[in-house]
Amino acid sequence: MKKISVVIKEAVENAFISLGYDKKYGMVSISNRPDLCQYQCNGAMAAVKEYKKAPLVIACEVADKLQLSEEGKIFEKIEAVKPGFINLTLKDEFLADYVNEMGGNDNFGYEAEGNPRKIVIDYGGPNVAKPLHIGHLRSAIIGESIKRTERFAGNEVIGDVHLGDWGLQMGLIITELKHRNPELVYFDESFTGEYPSEAPFTMGELEEIYPAASARSKEDEEYKNEALHATALLQSGNRGYLALWNHILSVSVADLKKNYENLNVSFDLWKKESDAQPFIPDMVEKMKADGFAHTSEGALVVDVAREDDKKEVPPCIILKSDGASLYSTTDLATIVERVKLFNPTDILYVVDKRQEMHFEQVFRTAKKTGIAPEELNLTFLGFGTMNGKDGKPFKTREGGVMRLERLIAEITEEVEAKMADREMDEETKHTVARQVGLAALKYGDLSNQAGKDYIFDLDRFASFEGNTGPYIQYTVVRIRSILDKFIAEKGITKAELDKFFADKKLVKSVTESERNLELVIAKFSDMIDLAATEFAPHKVCAYIYEAANCFSAFYHENHILTEQDEARKYSLLKLSYITEKIIVKCLDLLGIDAPERM
């Protein structure tokens, strides 16, 4: 099914072409003056230079030609106005038919254009042995939403958590364990048997061990050197240390999966930094052999600065002077691994925007050295900071970094308090409060452009009014309530609604609110294209907020269930039904559930 913007654009383009003008001037956009028209074409003004005619003359010619064409029959009004705009208003019959067809189509008539892309999305990025905190929130929920939207748009998507499991943090944990429990078999160099399958620690203990080790290493130089030595032994294949490392991984990953599941976030791959290590030696040797890597102050580097750089871009360090690898080394080796395993068209990194320079160096190195094929798109999607009301990074009341599960619990409690007077049992109330709380948290984040910092305001995010997740969910509940009453009235089941509406048509709109709702619904496919192309979940949020507002006006202006004209009543109900399905799909693209009750 053609996008509505394409249907309109093609009609206008053909009018330009038939008059001898280039079709590029037939571009159409949604009107920024909805009081005057629904769509507009500004191409006549752009065509002035090429055709040496007044813009209004060109606009009038095109408007007249469009008026007489077969394609122009979709318009109620075509008007050329000064200085050269072409204002377009669709016929109500066309709009109703278009939305009606959407309702009967898979994916609401959305069809992807061009060849599907294969996209690897790197998001999440937690370190093992540490709890998820609010710093991990944005990467997880932005990445999850992009993954879902890209899949809906017809692309093949591989989501990778990319765990931090290699480096000094492992050495610190192993050293602290050795100090506390030197009798553990993992530290007995003469041991040659099978190591225990059960980890000698719980996740709770691990979470206490790492900060203790990290703090001690900053004050005790000997302890830090011991941790560095333990890291080197691990990375060179010490049996006992590798067994401990595997325990750390299994305990951490089990806990991480549980926490991500609570966020409604999932990954196709649980790859780790360590998985890229085998690719490093050959990668480094090739960089040297090809003349890209050279020694500078003892370190191995690749120069990536360009003459047109507006700011200094330092060389990318591949190996430190002691031969140790860095994050840049691992990230480059991970690109090697991903190209080898998946041959993607795109690799998207959803990470803190403060890492922009790091990824600029990595991307330039990957392209310069041929690690990344020329046609591979490497994209950095840097997200801003979630701040408290004081404008500083969000903290607990005690001033520490808040754990993600605590944040979710606090939001759930806040929503549950707002729902105190609801007539539902306590278990249902808690389940719904959790769904609504997560919607408040996710929508509050995703409705902002990813790159911008935003203020975390629990009262506002959890409100059932305004541009919030709970308001969108409430709109769905309201529509379902209307449909439930109709189901009871007709004596049919929910499962039979699709079949019932299949042969019912939307009739020409009578009210302004009805028309406005249809216009928003009709834009669905255009919105999906935009959100997928720009990796922009906030576009989905803006769309469903507009749809929810339009439905609210529609609900108040039209007597949906008491309409006396049967054809019109079924039309109003079917429009409500299509609206509900589209909002629920959009919520799903954001990783948000739609509760049955609120």
Predicted regions and their residues:
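Non-catalytic interaction-recognition regions
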Residues: 1-96, 113-598
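Short, charged, solvent-exposed linker or helix-capping segments at domain edges/interfaces
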Residues: 97-102
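Flexible, low-complexity linker/hinge segments
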Residues: 104-113
